[in-house]
């Protein structure tokens, strides 16, 4: 594809967050067009009203299509901002350190070709050509690494809506 974009998506248990917006980590699935079509995703023959009540907590978010489906609106928002409807995507995602053994599984889950979907009445086509997976919260620490370099250890806390991840860095 001629268009290439890089986007980071935070797959929180309460909210999906990207540079283009934030929305609840939930949806209502339907086989027919719902009455309210705001934040409506059409993918693989089904309609998804994005937002509302969050989905149940998943330790492994790759067990079903839920978090892939919840990623598509973020991609659409970014493409829309760029004024394009198709692109090769480099997707950045994060995992808590306590879940980081799932890194390769997460990468394989998101890396897909020829993805067609409609979001808010606009058709999109993307190839997720590369997925980069990072440990959550570490990037914030790395911004100030020199400031804390002399410490023997540092407790790093990542507060989510329904989770708390704590890491001791030596």
Protein language model features and the residues they cover:
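Glycine-rich phosphate-binding loop of actin/hexokinase-like ATP-binding domains
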Residues: 152-170
